[in-house]
């Protein structure tokens, strides 16, 4: 998978400092970077940085992403952390502890496909 554009735009020290500041100020929240998969035809999300409640499940977070990109009901959405599809029932805090980047952010990539096999007219 290509290097995150967030990582390309901000150097490691700046990202580390920002993640540490966020975790200190909001200890019950997870700093998450959300980016669309390169070859996906799903809409692009309007913002990349999210502060997610630690007790939110992956499934609930997927719902948040779906709302932000205004995804129609017949479209599926899949999120990947480190190229792996996390379980929908997993807490974001446990995914964060297992998969957070060296800079302190959790990087989530989303992608979609049409689950019913037909496109827009």
Swiss-Prot record:
Propeptide: 118-121
Topology relative to the membrane: Lipid-anchor
Coiled coil: none
Site (Cleavage): 117-118
InterPro entries for the chain: Atg8-like, Ubiquitin-like_domsf
One Pfam assignment: ATG8
UniProt KW keywords: Autophagy, Cytoplasm, Cytoplasmic vesicle, Cytoskeleton, Lipoprotein, Membrane, Microtubule, Protein transport, Transport, Ubl conjugation pathway, Vacuole
GO biological process, one term: autophagy
Predominant subcellular localization, coarse grouping: membrane
Protein name, entry field: Autophagy-related protein 8f
Primary gene name: ATG8F
């Amino acid at each position: 998978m290509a290097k995150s554009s967030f990582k390309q735009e901000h150097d490691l020290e700046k990202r580390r400092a920002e993640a540490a500041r966020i975790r200190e100020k909001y200890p019950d929240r997870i700093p998450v970077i959300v980016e669309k998969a390169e070859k996906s035809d799903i809409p692009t999300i309007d913002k990349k940085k999210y502060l997610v409640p630690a007790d939110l499940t992956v499934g609930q977070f997927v719902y948040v992403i779906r709302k932000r990109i205004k995804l129609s009901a017949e479209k599926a959405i899949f999120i990947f952390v480190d190229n792996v599809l996390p379980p929908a029932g997993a807490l974001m805090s446990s995914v964060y502890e297992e998969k957070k980047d060296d800079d302190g952010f959790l990087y989530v990539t989303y992608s979609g496909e049409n689950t019913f096999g037909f496109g827009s007219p």
